[in-house]
Regions:
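Functionally critical loop-and-helix segments that line ligand-binding/catalytic clefts
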Residues: 1-17, 21, 25, 146-209
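Acidic/polar low-complexity segments and flexible, solvent-exposed patches
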Residues: 2, 205-274
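Structural recognition of alpha->loop->beta junctions
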Residues: 82-96, 100-102, 143-167, 265-266
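Short Gly/Pro-enriched loop/turn and capping motifs at secondary-structure junctions
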Residues: 101, 137-140, 159-163, 175-178, ...
Length: 274
């Protein structure tokens, strides 16, 4: 488990060396927010936070706060984010932050879910590790969790433990944390996956189009080779009823969408939905 924070324009005075010395391993930095049409407004502190955190040796990822009202807008927002972050080396995910705005609470689960998928798919297609941020309640109340199983999640729940029934990789456990080097409150997070290693294993130049060797009946060394190659892309692999299951989560239930997800990335061969 790794200790982290997430920061934005709300944290204007940060001594990143002190933050590092305080035991913070990673920071998720707000790249900005998108308007209803997907246009990006960059956070006033984004560049400063990115420079300070990386100079201090802290792993970094980014998140976008969303006001997107359509899949077209969400895709545009993702494209704008990619333009901004391509100059940086990210070792944590690129996150889509969807919260209790009236456009979502007054909208439909169908539209909200499609907006999330549109952004996350666009980010993944650009070769980045995509993640959905929302609260535990928002996920069940305003989205269709069963349609979001292929995406890792950063769950907000301010409690002594996270009781989200859906798999997640990061838990935001308080909005009033205190860390040496930061004036005032800051969000605190725990990461339960080794994101730097996973992301390092993702070859962005090959992720979008990858041909895997296979046999008509995969077994033995062929199967092991396939498992190894898929694992290097940040997926878990496991056997169920004699079949190779693949996903970003290590359970059968959470692997159901992965065949379509892999095919969209260009994998071909013995990839099927079981």
């Amino acid at each position: 488990m790794k200790n982290g924070i997430d920061v934005s324009y709300c944290q204007t005075k940060v001594d990143w060396n002190k933050v590092k010395a305080a035991g913070i391993d990673f920071a998720l930095i707000r790249v900005g927010y998108c308007y209803n049409n997907g246009a990006l407004k960059i956070d006033n502190m984004f560049k400063s936070h990115m420079a300070g955190a990386t100079a201090a040796g802290i792993d970094v990822g980014v998140y976008l706060y969303s006001y997107a009202t359509s899949t077209t807008a969400a895709k545009k927002a993702a494209q704008e984010v990619v333009k901004v972050i391509k100059q940086y080396t990210l070792t944590y995910p690129v996150c889509f932050d969807i919260e209790y705005e009236s456009i979502y609470t007054g909208g439909s689960k169908r539209v909200n879910t499609d907006i999330c998928k549109a952004f996350l798919d666009e980010i993944e297609d650009a070769g980045y590790y995509a993640m959905l941020y929302c609260s535990k309640d928002f996920l069940d109340s305003y989205l269709y969790p069963a349609e979001l199983t292929a995406y890792d999640k950063w769950i907000a729940q301010y409690a002594s433990k996270c009781t989200c029934p859906h798999p997640y990789g990061i838990w935001q456990y308080t909005g009033t944390g205190r860390v040496s080097g930061i004036a005032g409150n800051v969000d605190r997070d725990y990461a339960y996956k080794d994101y730097p290693t996973i992301i390092k294993g993702m070859d962005k130049t090959q992720l979008q189009k990858q041909q895997l060797p296979y046999s008509v009946i995969i077994s033995g060394s062929d199967l092991n080779s396939l498992k190894d190659q898929i694992s290097k892309k940040g997926y878990f692999t496991f056997m169920s009823d004699g079949k190779l299951c693949v996903g970003k989560f290590a359970t059968v239930a959470e692997a159901n969408k992965t065949a379509a997800d892999l095919k969209r990335k260009g994998f071909t061969g013995a990839v099927g939905k079981w």
